[in-house]
């Protein structure tokens, strides 16, 4: 979901020589036709030799890692599947990037926090109890050539209906909207723009940074989405479910000048 948005945005400019990678050739057919030629298929990130060969071939200045098992997949509960992808791979990739003098931009998640407090800063202790949150925390990179962006995203999947937007637009009749569930994420295309306009121009940024918008509850968010997409559906206020994983991105805003 994020990878296709990043590829689409960066390929719009002739100033960028862009290369994307996917594991399956079938994934390419899901991409907009105009960006398919930028993509190399058959890259399994668990195969170190393939990645090394790809990096040697492309010689990138910047690598944006959009690979990860998402919370909605059942495999994320299997440590033998989740840990190699979410935890180990980012660190291996950072080392590979260093070998070709490339900077790694890695994407993490607000799910490293339980959501009991809200407005988490980078100084707050990560307290996720589930394997997904723990695996993503272990995968956060902090090297001289790497930056980790903690955020939350919404957007359209290339296929399936697991993401919030895709799920909501596929519903009929009525859905619940959680008034006590707080979200501070951003659309995938906006994350891509932030990387282009604020992260890449600041090569000295390393370590973990929170990237967020102003917090909104999930009920209001769904109402906003329904209005934008002219979705005729009843959204029922639910006050029972309570979680607040909103992120305080003051550090990132001060360092880059970003304003949501």
Map each language-model feature to its residues.
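SDR active-site strand-loop-helix element
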Residues: 21, 66-67, 104-110, 114, ...
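NAD(P)H-binding glycine-rich loop region in Rossmannoid oxidoreductase-like domains
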Residues: 42-85
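N-terminal Rossmann-fold NAD(P) dinucleotide-binding loop
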Residues: 3-4
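N-terminal Rossmann-fold cofactor-binding loop
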Residues: 20-29, 44-45, 68
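Catalytic helix-loop patch of NAD(P)-dependent Rossmann-fold dehydrogenases
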Residues: 80, 84, 88-92, 111-149, ...
